[in-house]
Amino acid sequence: MELKIARAIIKHGLEDLYEYSDVDVAIVGAGPAGLTAARYLAERGHKVVVYERRFSFGGGIGPGGNMIPKIVVQEEAVPVLRDFKIRYKPVGDGLYTVDPAELIAKLAAGAIDAGAKIILGVHVDDVIFRGDPPRVVGLLWVWTPIQMSGSHVDPLYTQAKAVLDATGHDAEVISIAARKVPELGIEVRGEKSAWAEVSEKLVVEHTGRVAPGLYVAGMAVCTVHGLPRMGPIFGGMLLSGRRAAEIIHKDLVEEVYAVRA
């Protein structure tokens, strides 16, 4: 029995890693923006992998507002909630409350059911780039416990037509690319203090491509573009993820037509 368990895990786990070493879109971060983008991209037929450094979904959703188990979503994001069949309650002024556990579970299930592959416990260590001018064409990664231990272990690669940084406040992938590939011309300006009403709009407007092959969504947008933070209102995160999916899909389709031409 034990041997069968071990071989089943090794065989099918390694098959998944092999299959998803070459994808259309690699998303880093399984928070609200990353999971939303994954669902909308996967249902458009793109091969999507999501890497999450923790062994759980949701990013900053779980703690709610200062550990009170509710978060807020504004009117504009209600269509996204409906797409994922997430329940919400009106509180007035175009705002709604949502249960954090339900939001996490249904965002993740929606992405998985659409065809995205989510791999937990992955630390993205670097990007792959090609060309002059350069383009991001993939990622380097190790398992999170290896990174946390400080052990010197060479990472493995994932090839991707598009990489989406949805890592939250730290904008980890874009910060690495900005530092190590200065020819990409990326400036990480740093997140500002809170102004929720303004930032909820700006985070969606500034979602998109920051360099060839490299995109940003969610709180990482605030860090890259120097926007205010917003706290436990998550509509902007959902809308940012949806917009990132729309932009990436458009770019990938245009690239296919350009190659055929």
UniProtKB/Swiss-Prot annotation:
The keyword NAD applies. Its cofactor is Fe(2+). NAD(+) binds at residues 33, 52-53, 60, 124, 152-154, 219. Glycine binds at residue 229. One of its GO terms (biological process) is thiazole biosynthetic process. Keywords: Iron, Metal-binding, NAD, Thiamine biosynthesis, Transferase. Its EC number is 2.4.2.59. It comes from the Archaea. It catalyses: hydrogen sulfide + glycine + NAD(+) = ADP-5-ethyl-4-methylthiazole-2-carboxylate + nicotinamide + 3 H2O + H(+). GO terms for molecular function: iron ion binding; pentosyltransferase activity. NCBIfam families: sulfide-dependent adenosine diphosphate thiazole synthase. Belongs to the THI4 family. Homooctamer; tetramer of dimers. Involved in the biosynthesis of the thiazole moiety of thiamine. Catalyzes the conversion of NAD and glycine to adenosine diphosphate 5-(2-hydroxyethyl)-4-methylthiazole-2-carboxylate (ADT), an adenylated thiazole intermediate, using free sulfide as a source of sulfur. This is Thiamine thiazole synthase. It comes from Pyrobaculum islandicum (strain DSM 4184 / JCM 9189 / GEO3).
